[in-house]
Amino acid sequence: MRVLILGASYGTVFGTKCLMAGHDVTLVCRAPTAKLINEHGTHVQIRLEGHDQHRDFWSNDLAGRLDAMTPETVDAGSYDLAVLAMQEPQYANHSIATLLAMLAEAYVPCLSLMNMPPLPFLKRIPAIDMARVEAAYASPWVWQRFNPDLVSHCSPDPQAMRPPGQKANVLLVGLATNFKAAAFGAADANVLLSELSESIDTVRAIGQEVPVKLRRHRSIFAPFAKWSMLMAGNYRCVTTDAPISIHDAVYDAQDLAREVYDVTGEIVLRLGGTCDDLVPFEKYAKAALCLNKPPSVARAIDEGAPIVERVDRLIQGLGRQVGVTHGEIDRIVDLVDHRIARNSARAA
């Protein structure tokens, strides 16, 4: 299988698992990063169960073939599957938007690893009034050409970061959970998704399973389990001052974190999900014990970004559609609005 991955940062984790399973991968990234990867490959560190140290996985040692390209050099129609691993605002870039249009026109199935679900995926949910959610997106227009049945979405649960001082081709997986993918609306695309999932399942290193699997779920709502985590943790790491860790966001006010977590889950239920689609707060809180760094959205805001993924605003808007609101969600949205407006003013 030929897999195209837009975004060489987070996408490298998914790409490494594809390479282990014998699939060929192209990472789409900036020219300097593409040059680095084409010359030296990628290096992902994953800790196997029962081991204290992370194990190194170099792309040059894996079964599949890896290359990296800039978006304008990609032949979109030559791939079996595209994986969307950039943050939502990045798709407004002209060369990326053009590549998206080419993927849509070539009817290439697209699997999102974004925190922000692509708009065509949301179109598959009858309860959502699309006109009322587009304002949460930085570039809603880039999704107009897609067939919704060929767009699916993952809960991007694995946590990865670039170790301090390392180059752009190195990633360390800090929380090795699974990608939970909703089924596509198209049967042929689901065959591809199942084949990819099953092939990744067979991967072994020193006789052991390698963490970070791809799990296909029948429910379209399965990836939305991540929403509660984002609202109770990630977006509450944004403060009026320096960002805090997910651990601190959850444990410094655990009762409030649980409230936000449960209210966000209620929004998913009212959209049509079931309790089986959600993750209990206790399981999330246990995972948060080891999440001792600020998440990317909080770091980006602190570093002056004038635009970030607005999952907080999307969830607030969907909650209002289904009659579920909470003061802490409103506070989060207002604070993020304020911080990015201040960043925009400073950048002007």
Regions found by a protein language model. Give the residues of each.
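Rossmann-fold dinucleotide-binding core
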Residues: 77, 111-227
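Rossmann-fold NAD(P) dinucleotide-binding segment
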Residues: 73-118
